[in-house]
């Protein structure tokens, strides 16, 4: 952090609000590639990659601005030439975008540094850590009735991203360069290879587009910040990275124009005003839960669709928002199937000679392991077939038995660790069984034997560490408290380090 502040002169750039000259600084691209932290960036290094030099960057920008847009032709020779120019443009854009993504993050580095130095306290806007999502769902969802399952809309035009970023970065030259780069790349790839080029581009420039997408999501979440300030009872709990909006409150006069006058807005606010609204966002999905009725949630849905279409100038289909009743719907969120189950409870009461029954309905929040998506992921990784039957996984012949067992054991521990918050462990035990038997069959295949003959010849101690369940680990660690720990293990346990393996929530991890 000290080197970033030293070489980039962050305080000076912050006061001038002028980031464009930094694009021509060579050490920017060293920082963008995590270089230079172990040596002096300003010193000459003969082994340094010359493609990030000052002259190269200047030539790239000049060449992109002077590119002839009327080179598109139909014959084969010109098509090959166009493909050559397209590859050059992709290379140019990749180099500049890597440095630009680092530069536009400078205002946020400044804010973080000032916060660490105690100069300024960053407003949190009532944020929560991602670790609080599971306890929040467990504590609050059993008392709620309806939930809005919202898919966060994507901007349909690059100009929307540039306009949103304008409230964060006040340098017109940098924004103009970003607009030019995005438009030029989108137009060129649509003429050459739209699908393959855009896919490969998004993989190579994840940092820039992740920053632009987070800015878009922050603008989207500003709706709830605005409504919370209009109603002191509206509680907005965001579990995503919601940074502080800049100059947002200066746009209030424009926001209220949706309803006409300010008085009209205050008069219509009661339509979406409710003392117990909860908002959660994770990745590309968000939830808005309430105790209200179905009519109340429909009003919220209409309001959000109208606001997004007006404010973001994009068509937002109402079908991207689903209104679900928690008692009749299983919510797929963060790798779990969650619902609110009603447990009937009958109590017999007797007064003198008369007795009567009292029926109580107790709501309980359940979190289940989604067995079908997990089996599909295991089948994709060649651990089982599509029906969930374990199979042997082809491995390299040079891998030792301990390495194979360690790989299977690590996957099993990660899945067990992540889904330890499940209220029912049956599906989790099935996943463990698939991995354990697949490991045994893989080892037997390597030694050209059957599973039974392999275990009989080498002994079951080979898989003892891998087959050891978590309850056995608890018993060996604390034998005197085994009975109490058994009850703890069978209950829900939320681990605080699940963020490190949160790719399992998408069932897309490379097993």
From Swiss-Prot:
Keywords per UniProt: Chloroplast, mRNA processing, Plastid, RNA-binding, tRNA processing
UniProt GO BP = mRNA processing; RNA splicing; tRNA processing
Q: Which Pfam families match?
A: Intron_maturas2, MatK_N
Spans through the membrane: none
* GO cellular component entries: chloroplast
Q: Tell me, what is one Gene Ontology molecular-function annotation carried by this entry?
A: RNA binding
Q: Which InterPro entries match?
A: Domain_X, Maturase_MatK, Maturase_MatK_N
Subcellular location(s): the record lists: Plastid, Chloroplast
Look up keyword Plastid and say if it applies: yes
Family named by the database record: Belongs to the intron maturase 2 family. MatK subfamily.
Q: What does the UniProt record say this protein does?
A: Usually encoded in the trnK tRNA gene intron. Probably assists in splicing its own and other chloroplast group II introns.
Could you tell me which HAMAP family the record lists for this protein? MatK
Which PANTHER family does the UniProt entry name for this protein?
MATURASE K
List the protein's name. Answer: Maturase K
């Amino acid at each position: 952090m000290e080197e970033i502040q030293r070489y980039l002169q962050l305080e000076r750039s912050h006061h001038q609000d002028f980031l464009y000259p930094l694009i021509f600084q060579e050490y920017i691209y060293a920082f963008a590639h995590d270089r230079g932290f172990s040596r002096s960036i300003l010193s000459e290094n003969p082994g340094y990659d010359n493609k990030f030099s000052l002259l190269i960057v200047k030539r790239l920008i000049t060449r992109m601005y002077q590119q002839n847009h009327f080179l598109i032709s139909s014959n084969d020779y010109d098509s090959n030439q166009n493909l050559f120019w397209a590859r050059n443009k992709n290379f140019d854009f990749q180099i500049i975008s890597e440095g630009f993504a680092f530069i536009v993050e400078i205002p946020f580095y400044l804010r973080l540094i000032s916060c660490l130095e105690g100069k300024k306290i960053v407003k949190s806007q009532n944020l929560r850590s991602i670790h609080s999502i599971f306890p929040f769902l467990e504590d609050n969802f059993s008392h709620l009735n309806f939930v809005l399952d919202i898919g966060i809309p994507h901007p349909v035009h690059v100009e929307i991203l540039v306009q949103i970023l304008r409230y964060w970065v006040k340098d017109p030259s940098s924004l103009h360069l970003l607009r030019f780069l995005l438009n030029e790349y989108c137009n060129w790839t649509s003429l050459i290879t739209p699908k393959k080029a855009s896919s490969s581009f998004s993989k190579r420039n994840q940092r820039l587009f992740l920053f632009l997408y987070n800015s878009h999501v922050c603008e989207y979440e500003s709706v709830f910040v605005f409504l919370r300030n209009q109603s002191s009872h509206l509680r907005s709990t965001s579990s995503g990275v919601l940074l502080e909006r800049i100059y947002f409150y200066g746009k209030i006069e424009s926001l209220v124009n949706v309803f006409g006058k300010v008085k009209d807005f205050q008069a219509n606010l009661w339509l979406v005003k409710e003392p117990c609204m909860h908002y959660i966002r994770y990745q590309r999905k968000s939830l808005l839960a309430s105790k209200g009725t179905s009519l109340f949630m429909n009003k919220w849905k209409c309001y959000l669709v109208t606001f997004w279409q007006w404010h973001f100038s994009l068509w937002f289909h109402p079908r991207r928002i689903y209104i679900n009743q928690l008692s009749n719907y299983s919510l797929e969120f963060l790798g779990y199937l969650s619902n609110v189950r009603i447990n009937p409870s009958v109590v017999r009461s007797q007064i003198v000679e008369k007795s009567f029954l009292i029926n109580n309905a107790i709501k309980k929040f359940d979190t289940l392991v989604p067995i079908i998506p997990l089996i599909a992921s295991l089948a994709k990784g060649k651990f089982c077939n599509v029906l969930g039957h374990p199979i042997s996984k082809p491995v390299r012949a040079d891998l030792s038995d301990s390495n194979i067992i360690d790989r299977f054991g690590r996957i099993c521990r990660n899945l067990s660790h992540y889904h330890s918050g499940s209220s029912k462990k049956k599906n989790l035990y099935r996943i463990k069984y698939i991995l354990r038997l697949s490991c045994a069959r893989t080892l037997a295949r390597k030694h050209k034997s059957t599973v039974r003959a392999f275990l009989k010849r080498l002994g079951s101690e080979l898989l003892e560490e891998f087959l050891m369940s978590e309850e056995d680990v608890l018993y060996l660690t604390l034998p005197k408290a085994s009975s109490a720990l058994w009850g703890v293990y069978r209950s829900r346990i939320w681990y605080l380090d699940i963020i490190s393996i949160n790719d399992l929530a998408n069932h897309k991890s490379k097993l």
